Amino acid sequence: MTRIRRGYIARRRRTKIRLFASTFRGSHSRLTRTTTQQKIRALVSAHRDRGKQKRYFRRLWITRINAVIRDNRVFYSYSRLIHDLYKKQLLLNRKILAQIAISNRNCLYMISNEIIK
């Protein structure tokens, strides 16, 4: 059986993979088989961690809101605040509430006082 020379197609494919893996360390950026495996692994990790990132940020927002809410001036818990927000139909998500809690605490206190009434 004669050997088939692949031509520019295989070279183009390998070049594309090498460009993707150019910032990897050691043989992970030089050897073709290793770069292919590392590319697959990198994309799997990126896909998995996009889901994790959403979870981590939600946890961070909840922690920030809870820390400000449990301050001395408002005798409220996070779960009661969210429950009352839904009852009053105030559509503020956790991200916005966390930004308000950090930048302008008085505004969050005003919101919670309006809910209590």
Curated annotation (Swiss-Prot):
Subcellular location field: Plastid, Chloroplast
One Gene Ontology term of the molecular function aspect: rRNA binding
Keywords: Chloroplast, Plastid, Ribonucleoprotein, Ribosomal protein, RNA-binding, rRNA-binding
Gene Ontology biological-process annotations: ribosomal large subunit assembly; translation
InterPro entries to which the protein is assigned, alphabetical: Ribosomal_bL20, RIBOSOMAL_L20_CS, Ribosomal_protein_bL20_C
GO CC, alphabetical: chloroplast; ribonucleoprotein complex; ribosome
Segments passing through the bilayer: none
Origin: domain of life: Eukaryota
PANTHER family linked to this entry: 39S RIBOSOMAL PROTEIN L20
Protein family (similarity comment): Belongs to the bacterial ribosomal protein bL20 family.
Functional description taken from the UniProt entry: Binds directly to 23S ribosomal RNA and is necessary for the in vitro assembly process of the 50S ribosomal subunit. It is not involved in the protein synthesizing functions of that subunit.
NCBIfam families, A to Z: rplT_bact (TIGR01032)
Name under which the protein is recorded: Large ribosomal subunit protein bL20c
Lineage per the UniProt record: Eukaryota, Viridiplantae, Streptophyta, Embryophyta, Tracheophyta
